[in-house]
Amino acid sequence: MVLLDSLVGTIVGINGPVIKAEGMSKFKMREMVMVGKKKLIGEIIILENDLATIQVYEETSGLKIGENISSTGMPLSLKLGPGIIGNMFDGIQRPLKKINEISYGFIDEGIGLISIDEEKEWDVNIVVKVGDKLKPGDVYAEVQETNIIKHRIMVPQDVNGEVTKVKESGKYNIEEKIVTVKDGGNIYELNLYQRWPVRTPRPIKNRLSLGKPLITGQRILDMFFPIAKGGTVAIPGGFGTGKTMTQHQLAKWSDADIIVYIGCGERGNEMTEVLEDFPKLIDPKTNTSLMNRTVLIANTSNMPVAAREASIYTGITIAEYYRDMGYDVAIMADSTSRWAEALREISGRLEEMPAEEGYPAYLPSRIAEFYERAGYVENLNDTEGSVTVIGAVSPAGADFSEPVTQNTKRFVGAFLGLDRKLAYARHYPAINWLTSYSQYNVMLTDWYLENISEDIIELRNKMLKILFEENKLQEIVKLVGEDVLPDDQRLILEVARILKVGFLQQNAYHDEDTYVPKEKQYKMLKAIELFYDNAYKCVKMGIPISKIRNEEIFGDLIKMKYNIPNEDISGIKVIEEKISSYYEELIEQYRK
């Protein structure tokens, strides 16, 4: 990165991460600058005549008034190339492993804008030849980045022309020029990376309708509140309701090709847990370590607040880059509330007029900007890819009426509200089936009918209806007890208990239960439905509920999630046969 010596400003005010400087008339809005003697990384966020306001992405302790501001001549941007997958970055794409080697556990000020490894040599397969016409987005080389991710090197947005020179396939680092393209009088030498400004969405050819689900292996999501590839999801919940655990489960088991996990303003221990767990976990699709498809962006609560604001954009830009190669990417942002708090803090230091609860008036548009970068798209190189955004929201006191939750709700397609009462009752995932919803149910209907069963929609609605009825009946039970209810309503309570404990509750630490294939999920629901239909028939014949309630069958239905292996679900058939024969015999006895 070259500093432009001709452009120099002077610091005239310091307020935490916000710097005021003069002599800035030739600088540009959103330009990345180097601040002070330590060359701290900053970004111009307000430019008025000669005065500029700069937000600094590093600790500003020790800066003095009168120190210089240098120009880099480019916006805050990322280096996009091989070496991103399996790596862990801070909020502005500086690799934490490398920083650890330099400064031993602490991020020193002025460490510079280091990024992906420039010296590592990659096995590069060049897929173009002299005379080929190239346009933006075309693939001109391929690198096997991990054993499951093939990194496609694409033509940058400003390059268009004919290939005039090509190196042979072989070992190259990301800085070496491997292809030369001529466009009229312009000659472009292409290497293995490109730069992209974080706040600008990457271009696409077309947005496509959402029609494929993101299979997560979590029963409540896949069966009741499905997520579409390219969709947007909010997971709001108070302290201790399991937001991070739910995000970890989605990052581990969802069938996206690549996961970008952003720890935005959360505890450092949680990122440590990800770093310790993911390399040990095996991806069920590829039988290799989960780190081979994961990018981690760690911007913990004690890191500079301005970098927290940038980390969300860093994550989504990396996700879009891999989407452009034709991959399905899922991005986990934990938590967007901390990001909104960073906006609030910077807004306060800028002395902007606060809106509701002190958040800036532009909070809704910033949240929309982020979620609108999701989607299932046709790329410039005619491949299809998707970015699915799953954002955790941490409302203070589990108050869902606060601004971040309410504004997020406006822009997402699925809302998975976590419930304190469920969490305190140790029902995890604590997703409340009464307040949660997914608008993707309708969009994904065709896929579910084709790939699971023709009765799946009917079955899902029937089970949800039982859960809603049980909620109404609980009000009566609390007042007068269960015994006064008629038997058909008591049956609803029993079936809902099986559904809640045996189906909706899922153990993230159990080998069989942490991830459940969709076929087993469907068969489990069918077994519960078979029990309900047979038991309902008995109730209508006047058979007392005490006879209908068979503890052995109840136990089998509740424990089938643990006892029946995911690879061989024939055990569910045995349970169904037991249900059918027991209730047929019961009906025969009462007919006599």
UniProtKB/Swiss-Prot annotation:
Pfam families: ATP-synt_ab, ATP-synt_ab_N, ATP-synt_ab_Xtn, ATP-synt_VA_C. Signal peptide: none annotated. Keywords: ATP synthesis, ATP-binding, Hydrogen ion transport, Ion transport, Nucleotide-binding, Translocase, Transport. SUPFAM superfamilies: C-terminal domain of alpha and beta subunits of F1 ATP synthase, N-terminal domain of alpha and beta subunits of F1 ATP synthase, P-loop containing nucleoside triphosphate hydrolases. CDD domains: ATP-synt_V_A-type_alpha_C, V_A-ATPase_A. One of its GO terms (biological process) is proton motive force-driven plasma membrane ATP synthesis. It comes from the Bacteria. One of its GO terms (molecular function) is ATP binding. Its EC number is 7.1.2.2. Belongs to the ATPase alpha/beta chains family. Produces ATP from ADP in the presence of a proton gradient across the membrane. The V-type alpha chain is a catalytic subunit. This is V-type ATP synthase alpha chain 2. It comes from Clostridium tetani (strain Massachusetts / E88).
